[in-house]
Amino acid sequence: MPETVDLRAVPYELDDEQHAWVEETLAGLELEEKVGQLFFNLFHFGADSFSGTNLSNAEILAKYHIGGARYHGGTSEQVQDLLNALQASSRIPLLVAANCESGGNGCCNDGTYIASGAQCDAARTEEVPFRTGLVSARESAAVGVNLNFAPIVDILLNWRNTIVNTRAHGSTADDVIRSTDAKARGMRAAGEDVAVCIKHFPGDGTEERDQHLVLGVNELGPAEWDDSFGRVYAHHIGAGVEMIMAGHIALPEYSKLLDPSLTDADIMPATLAPELVQGLLKTRLGFNGVVVTDASHMLGMTSAMRRQDYVPRAIASGCDMFLFFNDMAEDFGFMLDGVRSGVITAERLDDAVRRILGLKAKLNLHRKQADGTLQRAREDLAVVGCAEHLQWRAEAADASITLVKNTLDQLPLRPETHRRIRLYYLDTDSGGIFEASQRALDDVREELERRGFEVTVNDGTSRVKGATLKYRDEVDAAIVVANVVGYAAENNYRIRWKTPMSTDCPWYVHEVPTVMVSLNYTTHLHDATMVKAYVNAYHDNPDTIRLVVDKLTGESEFRGTYNDLVWTEKWQAKL
């Protein structure tokens, strides 16, 4: 018998009034309204480039009765205006989610980045992830968000994986628990009624592929999973996490243990696997909260079966909310047909909607709607990008920037001894969902010049090196800055030189002192094993760049700690 929700228990612990609101609201819903509560819609500023609808936001709410909202982009004022309007137009208050994985920058364009998961791990202190969670909740609440799709509780076990390379909080269960527990506590400490959603069950980071592009597979056996990802999920469930995002990631060995009839051909991502969501997560681990699918346009889901089938199957399998429409009318019809045909039973539908309404009641959204405090005011935005948060960003960078190696003692670099710097800058194509800062190269150059260095930026579009003696006569040191950023256009991201055997390639490591600095991914030594000094800095914001230069010049100590994945299983990387 599938587990059904207990609204008196963790994570809801509803009082009599809250419980009554849930039951009365549920009893008053028509079938179409119940189905609508299952959906998160992705809203846009301007034309909808995702589902292609021509409906106004108010028309979407009136026609499809959605339970949750996400949005893409926008300044804090734009986001606040959007979310206020959505809440004003919705009869039942909305769950409004943001991806604040690293701070308030996940809820609005002018929000404050604090620290990525990798950065939190490198800092080896609970203060950095706690502050990251605190800022995430403060700034997201100010714009009207009440649910954070974070922290990420994946474990980075495979160094080739780049989709969670910087987002995961470590390479062991203990490290992930330490950092993500602090981040969740920081979110709750804000006192802003922002719910926590951990992701991506049953766990990313074991393989190199990206579930955005292909079915993800976690190949761990049941005992291994229980002692790693299982411990992480059990910890957060015990701590009262309200929501868990199921990934489009299969866990085949555990699926076959729970349902011995399954063959390889039957293995599904967790989002479509009742033995994982109902059996492992809700029954064995005792999760009583809301399960939401990861985004339904991802290939890990779309490659499983027809959309007509997987839309209702996700809910039938134990997920309670479905993330994003493709075509609104079609998807809504698919879900409604799934209920009418019995794919989704009446009991499963009511249980899912009861969980959704229960979370809304826990967040007091109905009370705020009744007393007129659900919409946020302009003065609330004063916290976004405030001086305290910017100071915390700088302190997080200082605590985490990591000297991975300096085997020839080439650091520090000082203008008195290494005045003429050849600067090599490596980035990725622009135009993606995530991309490198357009200011990063200028920021690095200006910081170096401010300290008295003479900086020449290399033109890496050529493969002509020129005379090596002339190079040594003109250059005192080389700094290679890798700002490789990417998301869901490739299964993994590595350094891509500007041209075959570009002059950016570190051919010069034995000619002049050479240091490589990564502003994002932590494993570039795989493609640059020859460099003798290597630094992981984790981000390209101005504070981080300033502090990196402080540390390269010996004005500040390196304080971050690396994990052994930085060596990418290459013995020569340590030389």
Feature map (PLM): residue ranges:
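Short glycine-enriched loops at secondary-structure junctions
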Residues: 44-47, 96-106, 146-156, 198-204, ...
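Second-shell residues forming the walls of enzyme active-site clefts
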Residues: 79-94, 104-108, 171-348
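Preference for extracellular/luminal or secreted protein segments
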Residues: 1-60, 273-274, 283, 304-575
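A substrate-binding/cap region within the structured catalytic cores of diverse enzymes
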Residues: 123-145, 152-173, 180, 184, ...
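Hydrophobic faces of well-ordered beta-strands that scaffold small-molecule active sites
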Residues: 35-43, 67-71, 94-102, 147-151, ...
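Short, acidic/polar
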Residues: 47-63, 128-139, 224-235, 305-311
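Short acidic, glycine-rich surface-loop motifs adjacent to enzyme active sites
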Residues: 36, 57-76, 236-268, 473-490
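Active-site-adjacent structural elements in enzyme catalytic domains
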Residues: 76-93, 126-142, 354
